[in-house]
């Protein structure tokens, strides 16, 4: 949900894994 809200986080799988 939070990843979908942030395009930058969605672009980076590493950041998505951290979040």
Swiss-Prot record:
Domain of life of the organism encoding this protein: Eukaryota
GO cellular component, one term: extracellular region
Post-translational note: O-glycosylated; contains disaccharide galactose-N-acetylgalactosamine attached to threonines.
Major subcellular location class: secreted
Keyword Secreted: yes
Compartment list: Secreted
Keywords carried by this UniProt record: Antifreeze protein, Glycoprotein, Secreted
Function of the molecule: Antifreeze proteins lower the blood freezing point.
Record protein name field: Ice-structuring glycoprotein 7R
């Amino acid at each position: 949900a939070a990843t979908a809200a942030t395009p930058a986080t969605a672009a980076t799988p590493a950041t998505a894994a951290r979040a």
